Amino acid sequence: LPKRDDRRRETILEIARDVFMMQGFAATSMSAIATRLGGSKGTLYNYFKSKEELFGAVVSRECAGLAASLFENVPPDGEMRQRLTHFGRVILSRLLEDGPIRLQRIIVAETERFPEIGAAFYESGPRQIQDRLSAYMAADIAAGRLSEADPRIAAAQFKDLVLSNIHQQKLWGV
């Protein structure tokens, strides 16, 4: 896509994200998004074949951005404890923000009808986080800073320990 088309696509994704977050997936129409955009449904369909495809693109974009932000400013060669503490604080604070929680609720509600939305969420969010954290763990194991272990299991256990029940309580509003 030319740069102008890239900018237009990004604008569509930003506006669609806002509308989906306010109204949820089921209550959002392409007409409502087009109205907020100041364009036509035809413009939306030039970029996305369906509301589901548009929502999938919103989910992928939001998750990729969130996953990347979790690894900003991680001390590259610092003490393992320092890096894990930093990551734990960031993941806990970012995943408990209202936006990510709201997005997860929408995804959970729609995944049964549209499994590709759940897959897009998993691949661009949780899987990316798992892969990057596993890479950190593998490097620490190789450098002798962490006991021999399966880095994927260690990463999953660490993430789950950090989030514990707090994430579930926030997600379910209790």
Report each predicted region and the residues it spans.
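Hydrophobic/aromatic-rich alpha-helical bundle segments in the mid-to-C-terminal region
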Residues: 119, 141-174
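Short, structured helix-loop boundary elements
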Residues: 9-10, 30, 52, 56, ...
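Basic, helix-initiating cap at the start of DNA-binding domains
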Residues: 1-39, 47-53
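Short loop-to-helix capping motifs
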Residues: 50, 113-115
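Short amphipathic alpha-helical interaction/hinge segments
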Residues: 62, 66-70, 99, 115, ...
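Amphipathic alpha-helical packing segments from all-alpha helical-bundle domains
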Residues: 93, 102, 106-108, 116-142, ...
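Key DNA-contact positions within bacterial/archaeal DNA-binding proteins
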Residues: 42
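Amphipathic alpha-helical linker/stalk segments
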Residues: 56-87, 93-95, 99, 103, ...
